[in-house]
Amino acid sequence: MTLGDPCSVEQPPPPPIDFSRSLIAPTAIKQESHLIPSTPGTPTAFQPPQHANTPIPGIQPNLFNPAIMAAQLNVFSNPQLMAMMQATRNPLLGHPSVVGPPMMPNIIQQLNALRNVQLSNANTMANLQNMSSSPKHTNGSSERSENCGELCVVCGDKASGRHYGAVSCEGCKGFFKRSIRKRIGYVCRSQKDCPVTKFHRNRCQYCRLRKCLSMGMRSESVQAERRPVNNSSMLCNNDNNQQNTTPEHLSPNLLLSLVKLEHETKLGGLEALIKPGSPVMLQNTQDYMDVKRESIGEDEMTVIGLVPPSASPTSSGVGSSSSISDDSGPIYTSERARFEISVPLNTQNPRNHQYISEITTRLLFLTVHFVKDSRVSLRTSTMEGLLKSKWCDLYILALMQTADKIKLGQLLDNLTNQMAMGMECGQYSAEKFEKISEQMQRLLQLSQLFASRELTAVEYAYLKMISFTAQDLPSSMASPETRSVNQMASQELFEYVSSSKSTQNHMSNEHINVDDSTSEDNDTHVTSQQSSVNIAAERFSRILQLLPCLRWFDPATIVEIFFSGLIGPMSIETIIPFVLQMNLMSFFDQKMELGSGGASDTLSTSSLSEMMNNQ
């Protein structure tokens, strides 16, 4: 156009573009057409036709908004991009009637690629910022956790990890394990508030154990660790290490541990013993019912396991109904009634935990051995049932008989101190501790009562047999053979009391106090025979009056006092069948004879090996 052209009109300057609106008004579109130079008759891709405002079917006007994209991409300062975006805002660019190169897809792809790059850069920068800040936070938390686990909560030494429920060092871990496993009782010489530090932790073991428990170390974790995972592998290891093991390395509770191990492996666990009809139980019972042990007094130096069944003069068949063996004589003599226990030489202090464990173990084995090797020939099933129901009575009588030898009073005092410490640490409730203390007091009271009666070894033996065969419990087995043995034992006890020298001495000291002047009078004269019978009857009655005192005790509490740390969750009734089947003579021949110079303070390795191999 020229200045002389009548159609030329001076155009006002275009208003600024408003990108804040999602849709552009038609007047704005007309004004936008002046931004792009054009020549008449030459349509370009950037000059929309007159019907630009007409909506085209299938085209969404809000599909591409340059204002929003410019704000997101921050490209307001770039005029080229703004022009391209303004051009792509027209939906007719992609219409087939438009002449020109199809620039719309390329522009959209470029813008999308640019937007993706900027978003990727933004995400990368955010990740870098997170990575730069997160290691510091992680390191701080890990350092705090390491700092929390570095010190032992008991003594403050460097901790090696979490042991038995608390972060502790190796020293406190080993100390706690030894104390719980061996049930060692400690006594504080101060006010039970001794400092437990890295440098003073060994001064007071009582306060150290108390602090271990108070800081969260669990004793049940130690007990669970004692149970073997694989019994067969332990048996192989025991067989390989028996030749290299010395007697001083044997633990005090090794006897009952071997019994428990043998019980779990040979008979297939507790179920085989609980079920009397199981084939394993019947097979093992049949193997041992054909063997009758010799009595103690006939040949004590002979290992019964080496004597064939036919060589024993007192052997009887399985179906034998006789209660007493065929050889003549009483059930017990002074030789057969010997009940002797050897005290460990290196642990004779009753306050030593090893002493308590060794004494209780030997006493239980010796009691079962004493009943089994008596001259009474009871069937194996009958003897097993009687021992399961009467083991507590026999064990109490054994404690009374050996009270002076094992220092029962000091032993019970030590056990009381251990129980008191356990109650303070939460192992025992107040009610349970009171019940255990009551049973211990009754043991001391009964020991004084037995000491006043001054029973001999033969009287103790007959008292055990009478109590063993007495039908004074609801679970007692009533059979003709047990009644016959009980009657025979009672009769022989009365005969022994009548003929014993102690009764005659007692009669001469107390009852034969007749003046010479009255001896001439036949009406007031008391013959020695009548006096002897009266005194024997009185002593016999006083001996039998001791049996009801055995009902003072609860078998479960006796197990808690003496055997809780030795047999664990097992019961004495479960162990008894094993003890009956074992060759116990190898333990009590030459190894446990009282007064022999070669008596060993612990059971020898050869005896333990023989027990494992003979079963």
From Swiss-Prot:
User: Is this entry keyworded Plastid?
Assistant: no
**At which residues is the DNA-binding region annotated?**
149-224
- Domain named NR LBD: which ranges? 323-583
Query: What's an example GO cellular component term for this entry?
Result: nucleus
Q: Check the record and name the Gene3D superfamilies matching this protein.
A: Erythroid Transcription Factor GATA-1, subunit A, Retinoid X Receptor
Question: What GO biological process terms are annotated to this protein in UniProt?
Answer: cell differentiation; regulation of transcription by RNA polymerase II
**Compartments, as annotated in UniProt:** Nucleus
Q: Which GO terms describe its molecular function?
A: nuclear receptor activity; RNA polymerase II cis-regulatory region sequence-specific DNA binding; zinc ion binding
Q: Name the predominant localization.
A: nucleus
Q: Which domain of life is it from?
A: Eukaryota
Please describe the organ and tissue distribution of this protein's expression: Seam cells, excretory cell, rectal epithelia, chemosensory neurons, gut, head/tail hypodermis.
The answer, when asked if Cell inner membrane is one of the entry's keywords, is no
Q: Where is this region: Disordered?
A: 310-329
- Zinc fingers, NR C4-type, are found at 152-172, 188-212
Key words, A-Z: DNA-binding, Metal-binding, Nucleus, Receptor, Transcription, Transcription regulation, Zinc, Zinc-finger
The family database entries (InterPro entries) matched by this protein are listed as: NHR-like_dom_sf, NR2C1/2-like_DBD, Nucl_hrmn_rcpt_lig-bd, Nuclear_hormone_rcpt_NR2, Znf_hrmn_rcpt, Znf_NHR/GATA
What functional role does this protein have? Answer: Orphan nuclear receptor that may have a role in dauer formation.
Q: Which family does it belong to?
A: Belongs to the nuclear hormone receptor family.
Q: What's the name of the protein? A: Nuclear hormone receptor family member nhr-41
